[in-house]
């Protein structure tokens, strides 16, 4: 049996530039891998993908990716996958996309790399726009739907705390609430990202997070509580995770326990 770790990400800012000809929205974002992981176990056996939280196999991005891998390569996959989910679904942390990228990269290696890095990137990107980032990791600017990546080194370090309410945010619902007034120019977003890369985290903005706070009162409650504690809150992706730079106080931990929020303290 092989064990691999599947990291989460946060978005250190996300801007929507408009619509692509495909109908998808064009975004600009700064991805940051964080040391918060799902644990994935791979063993030889009948192709099966299971999780500890009961995600139906046919809905799991990993299963979809493995079936597509079989179709493209003509190779039958004889591996059973078990995913210990620590990263909540619908949290804006890219857990499912990370699982997809990590498993397909490992299975490709185990089978002698029938797919090139570019082919693997195209495969996972066809299933999830966030997935190609997890083949790269660390920090990267995401353009297009998020799949056109530019690796960068940021000046951001130190403690970061995630606060995750008990609500799963629907990315589709958030995107469908976008209006033209939410769009910004590429020049505006590029300038913001360069400032954030240099360590000016107060420049972080996320229009999807603003919409998620309107759609899901639970996210806004966390956001307002973090503000009350004196920190500047940020939303990752389309929610539901709210994060801030700093450690978790006893007051936050107590409030989180009462409200069922998950608190994760990390070091960047």
From Swiss-Prot:
Any one GO biological process: isopentenyl diphosphate biosynthetic process, methylerythritol 4-phosphate pathway
Pathway stated in the Swiss-Prot or TrEMBL entry: Isoprenoid biosynthesis; isopentenyl diphosphate biosynthesis via DXP pathway; isopentenyl diphosphate from 1-deoxy-D-xylulose 5-phosphate: step 3/6
Chain positions recorded as ATP binding sites: 88-98
EC number: 2.7.1.148
Residues annotated as signal peptide: none
Catalyses which reaction(s): 4-CDP-2-C-methyl-D-erythritol + ATP = 4-CDP-2-C-methyl-D-erythritol 2-phosphate + ADP + H(+)
Keywords linked to the UniProt accession: ATP-binding, Isoprene biosynthesis, Kinase, Nucleotide-binding, Transferase
Gene3D superfamilies per record: 3.30.230.10, GHMP kinase, C-terminal domain
Molecular function terms, GO-annotated: 4-(cytidine 5'-diphospho)-2-C-methyl-D-erythritol kinase activity; ATP binding
Stretches assigned to coiled coil: none
Entry superkingdom: Bacteria
Active site (catalytic residues): 9, 130
Function: Catalyzes the phosphorylation of the position 2 hydroxy group of 4-diphosphocytidyl-2C-methyl-D-erythritol.
PANTHER family noted in UniProt: 4-DIPHOSPHOCYTIDYL-2-C-METHYL-D-ERYTHRITOL KINASE, CHLOROPLASTIC (PTHR43527:SF2)
Record-stated family: Belongs to the GHMP kinase family. IspE subfamily.
NCBIfam families registered for this protein in UniProt: ispE (TIGR00154), PRK14611.1 (NF011205)
Record-given protein name: 4-diphosphocytidyl-2-C-methyl-D-erythritol kinase
Highest classification ranks of the organism: Bacteria, Pseudomonadati, Aquificota, Aquificia, Aquificales
Gene name of this polypeptide: ispE
């Amino acid at each position: 049996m092989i064990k691999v770790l599947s990291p989460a990400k946060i978005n250190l800012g996300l801007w929507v530039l408009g619509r692509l000809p495909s109908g998808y929205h064009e975004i600009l974002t700064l991805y940051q891998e964080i040391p918060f992981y799902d644990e994935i176990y791979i063993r030889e056996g009948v192709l099966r993908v299971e999780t500890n939280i009961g995600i139906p196999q046919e809905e799991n991005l990993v299963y979809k990716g493995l079936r597509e891998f079989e179709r493209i390569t003509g190779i039958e996959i004889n591996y059973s996958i078990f995913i210990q989910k620590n990263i909540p679904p619908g949290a804006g942390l890219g857990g499912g996309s990370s699982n997809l990228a990590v498993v397909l990269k490992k299975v490709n290696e185990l089978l002698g790399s029938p797919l090139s890095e570019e082919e693997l990137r195209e495969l996972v990107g066809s299933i999830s726009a966030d997935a190609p980032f997890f083949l790269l990791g660390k920090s990267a600017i995401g353009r297009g739907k998020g799949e056109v990546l530019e690796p960068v080194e940021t000046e951001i370090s130190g403690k970061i705390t995630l606060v995750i309410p008990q609500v799963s945010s629907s990315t589709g619902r958030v995107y469908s609430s976008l209006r033209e007034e939410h769009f910004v120019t590429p020049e505006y977003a590029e300038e913001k990202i360069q400032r954030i890369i240099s360590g000016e985290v107060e420049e972080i903005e996320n229009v999807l997070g603003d919409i998620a706070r309107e759609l899901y009162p639970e996210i806004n409650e966390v956001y307002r509580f973090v503000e009350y504690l004196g920190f500047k809150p940020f939303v990752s992706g389309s929610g539901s995770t709210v994060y801030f730079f700093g450690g978790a106080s006893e007051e936050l931990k107590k409030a989180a326990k009462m409200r069922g929020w998950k608190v994760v303290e990390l070091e960047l």
